[in-house]
């Protein structure tokens, strides 16, 4: 029964995000400036001057086991990623308090950005708004997006990953509306 419910949630999630397409390989990455979880100013343009590439990924929240697994895998391979000249950034709509919960669960030591106004999510075309049925299903599982994100917008990102080279061009995209599928570290290392 639980498996059927999860399949139903997955189907609703897929229908909800049908309009999102994400950005494509070869496009110029939208520039952004934001503060990370440590208060450090993160400016994409400046990072690309001092790093070979930026690995930019979007995640849903500390309540998502698939997000936590992906973040932990990135953290476990962070030395390999940085050895290839990459700077890793996670972007999420969740509050700073919940970013800290994500960090506690995953031991992430890379920059995590709260995209409070969805500017980055919108620029990368990964934002979607959950319909009321899906919001209520999540609430039934104890997931309160209003509390987690600090608003009642019910907006989440498609869990996408981009590699942006030093020229600002997107050289790799993983964009899958199935929230269970993420870019593997092996794939990222191969693409860097």
For each predicted feature, which ranges?
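Short loop/turn microsegments at loop-to-beta-strand junctions
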Residues: 29-30, 53-54, 158-160
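Bacterial Sec-dependent N-terminal signal peptides
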Residues: 1-22
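Short active-site neighborhood of thiol/selenol oxidoreductases, capturing the structured segment around
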Residues: 45-68, 72-74
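Thiol/selenol-based redox catalytic cores and closely related redox-interacting motifs
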Residues: 115-180
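Structural microenvironment flanking redox-active thiols in thiol-disulfide oxidoreductases
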Residues: 69-125
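A short, polar/charged loop-to-alpha-helix boundary motif
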Residues: 179-191
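N-terminal "domain-start" segment that seeds a small globular fold
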Residues: 19-46
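Solvent-exposed, acidic/flexible segments
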Residues: 60, 67, 92, 157, ...
């Amino acid at each position: 029964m639980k498996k059927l419910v999860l399949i139903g949630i997955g189907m609703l999630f897929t229908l909800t995000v049908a309009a999102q397409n994400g950005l494509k390989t070869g496009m110029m990455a939208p520039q952004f400036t934001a503060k990370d979880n440590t208060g450090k100013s993160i400016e994409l343009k400046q990072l690309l001057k001092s790093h070979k590439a930026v690995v930019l990924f979007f995640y849903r929240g500390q309540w998502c086991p698939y997000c936590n697994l992906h973040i932990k895998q990135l953290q476990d391979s962070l030395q390999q990623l940085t050895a290839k000249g990459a700077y890793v950034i996670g972007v999420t709509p969740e509050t700073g308090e919940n970013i800290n919960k994500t960090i506690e669960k995953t031991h992430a030591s890379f920059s995590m950005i709260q995209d409070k106004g969805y500017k980055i999510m919108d620029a990368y075309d990964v934002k979607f708004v959950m319909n009321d049925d899906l919001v209520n299903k999540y609430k039934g599982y104890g997931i309160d997006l209003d509390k987690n994100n600090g608003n009642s917008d019910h907006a989440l990102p498609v869990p996408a990953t981009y590699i942006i080279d030093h020229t600002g061009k997107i050289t790799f995209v993983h964009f899958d509306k199935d929230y269970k599928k993420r870019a593997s570290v092996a794939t990222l290392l191969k693409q860097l």
